[in-house]
Amino acid sequence: PLSEPKGVEAVVLKISQGNMSQEEIIFTKGDLIFTDIIDPKKRVVYKEQIKQDRIAGQLSKVFKAESKDNIIKLGNDPKKPTILMLTDALCPFCRKEMARIEETLKNNNVDIIMTSVHGDDGHAKSALIYKEIKGAKTDEQKIAVFKKYYAEDNKAGAKDVSAAELNAAKALAAKYFGAGVNSVPYIIELDKLK
């Protein structure tokens, strides 16, 4: 049962066929079934809130077990909150987010994990970013590496990395997509990971 609205229950249905499955959230009250509930006064879309809470729970487990080598840290101000950003160098929306990373750092520390959705070339860029960032000492140097590989004219791809590096980048992304993330950039405050 949901605490609000009173008397309404959320039900998570898992629909499977073969090796594919997806979850659907519905709401019930008595004999009635609703596909979503929206509270305009509180500005809450309950279905989306439940989805995000479920993803945060799964993401928390994966992130807490993540190797420090796979988390690129920008900012180190204990007074600022930290956000987790899952991103892809070939994603146009991720490029926009990365273009304003300095602005984001004014109010947040950022932990970045490369999670490409764009096939081998995207995973290759992830691997190249991790490799090159190991030598970066400052946030400015790390940001320069990101901007290099996020540039639309950067043609780095699968031919530029070993099979092992490519497979490691694929496995890293698969962990986070397996936790329920289905698009990038995916940004969440670390405090929300329970």
Where are these regions (language model features)?
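Non-globular targeting/processing and membrane-anchoring segments
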Residues: 1-82, 125, 145-194
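Structural alpha/beta surface segment adjacent to cysteine/selenocysteine redox centers
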Residues: 81-161, 177-182
